[in-house]
């Protein structure tokens, strides 16, 4: 809880080095002015630590495009149960020498070593984010839509499924928000550069709509 320092932000190399007690949101706040972000986005990002994210290989809605924590850590410093200090990984995106101990430690939930420092890989912030909400009268059509959407060239940045139980909770607070016969809903998000979203053929929006089941 005392290891809460952001050691360095290096936009030229798309890297931020932090101690494990730094909050996920603090990393986002520190890197956003440089035009970057750290993609892991668990629902607890406002109050979960980077060390906790690494220990569980946390992910969130954007894992569909960006993956989980394991894809966004370049290197670690840690102390093993025997009291040995180890350094894994490297400072660069391309690291092909030796055993990939970094990925081994990520998701180990503290059973292999205690993390003391993490070198995180940053990603450029998308300049445009767009969203579509789709309602379905049956689960099979919704499942078919998910398969079709994931086959598009423009991968969605988030794809969330809400079943009838979730929709009933929404109706309890906002009775007129959803069509009466809706039993499933998809919340679809795409991101990227303005040119990518506007001029890709077909556009992400048209591509998504074209892959929706006719029912």
Q: PLM features: residue spans?
A:
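A conserved active-site cap/scaffold subdomain adjacent to cofactor or substrate pockets
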Residues: 182-198
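Hydrophobic alpha-helical segments, chiefly the membrane-spanning helices
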Residues: 210-215
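FAD-binding subdomain of flavoenzyme oxidoreductases
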Residues: 5-160
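Active-site beta-loop-alpha junctions enriched in small/polar residues
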Residues: 162-164
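Short glycine/threonine-rich loop-to-helix capping motif typified by GTGT followed
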Residues: 168-179
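Short basic, glycine-rich beta-strand/loop surfaces that mediate nucleic-acid
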Residues: 1
